[in-house]
Amino acid sequence: DEMGLGKTLQVLSLLAARPVAEKPDLIVCPASVVPVWREEIERYFPHLETDVLKTGNDFVGRTDPVIWIASYTQLRKHRELLPQVEFGYAVLDEGQFIKNPDAKVTQTTYAVRSHHRIVLTGTPLENRQLDLWSIFRFLLPSLLGSRSSFETQLNADRAGTMGRLRAQLAPFILRRTKSQVATELPQKVEMDLHCPMTEVQRAEYARICSEGLQRLGDDVSAAIREKSFGFLALLTRLRQVCCDPDMLPWRRSPLSDSGKIGLLIEKLAEVIESGHKVVIFSQFVMLLDRVKEALSESYPNLTQFELTGMTLDRQKPGQEFQTCDDPAVMLVSLKAAGTGITLHAADYVFLLDPWWNPAVEAQAVDRVHRIGQTKTVFVYRMVTAGTIEERIQDLKASKRELFDKLIGGLGGDFDLSQHFSSLQDLVTLTQETTEKDLDNADNADGAENDS
């Protein structure tokens, strides 16, 4: 399902209404979501007995029909106990955690014995079709055949295999979208906001491109195959300079050197003044720290909250953001945004550094645009004009249809070598006029006003 449509409550309703006699159940989820499952059970089904798997408290200790809640890490640590217990239901929440069939945690889930198996996810196609094979290796081990035969068929006839795959999997997938289920949800307005580059950014970007091309050559496939570390390092440096040159390890720059942060602060002025709440997402915690600094300078009285992978109590900042009466900004790392938080008190979302996985972005946005939202949600993807960021956005738009063919819009990463043969074409800065940037910003403002 898309995020926020009540997968948790649906599963708990099933476990309560149709239990397997005398069998315990197992719910496996990211560690940050364990408290969420416990709270939902206590709230809606207080008669159901629960227990949390941890060191010193495991399956051997009790044999009654309890609902075990386990993080993926704890399940892996207790793998040797799995042959000793058979569950009624085995539920994997955020099933993309087992997308890599070679990972130890994935192998552990394959060892689970149960009468029924359920996987909950909004994004099973995060990277490649093998992710889907891995999920179904847990659900129905023989359905898609061996991994080697599956990959051979894909390599021989990708289009034909994807068509057959969709038909083969359709009976086993319940795919619900907001437009089907949450018809009361207000509109979501999405737009790319093109950000200008400062002279410092432009100079650093050009220098990094030049040095990267000298080291890697112009053949994207060869660079990925033979110098993958250098290729990824080049992409990371270019993304960093697009956001803020201060993120480069060899520079210390004032906030004014970042065109993206400058435009963000400018866009926030009217939003905050009008009393709205805002969620700002980034993959870079370092960039969020810089935005926090800029917000403190420009809006010293603004209430700020933060949620990153380093946040110990993930529930607290979300709850405080949801309940505070004043305009507020929540700074969230994409890594922390994937699971277990609701932020629908906000109605403005800024994605500071969109990249090539639309599924990750959708997960983040769905923290705001979900059941309970009562306002139109405005989503800005901040894309630095004329750079690799803009090229990746164009690529995502043109290739979305390819991934729609498999399971209706679940999204996925892209192999850059399939779409760019020339590294220079991928990374080199193109000359974008500031007039275009201003036009796009004006159009974005118009979209808000029209709504």
What are these regions (language model features)?
Residues 69-70, 74, 80-84, 143-250, ...:
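Inter-lobe coupling linker of SF2 helicases/translocases
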Residues 19-103, 150-154, 259, 264, ...:
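SF2 helicase/translocase NTPase motor core
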Residues 3-4, 11, 27-30, 41, ...:
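Generic structural signal for small/hydrophobic residues in well-ordered secondary structure
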Residues 8-22, 108:
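Walker A/P-loop NTP-binding motif
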Residues 14-18, 37, 135, 208, ...:
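Hydrophobic residues on the short alpha-helix immediately C-terminal to a glycine-rich phosphate/catalytic loop
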Residues 99-100, 104-107, 112-148, 182-210, ...:
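SF2 helicase/translocase ATPase core recognition
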Residues 10, 19, 183-201, 206, ...:
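Conserved Helicase C-terminal RecA-like lobe
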Residues 435, 439-451:
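Short, low-complexity, charge-dense intrinsically disordered segments
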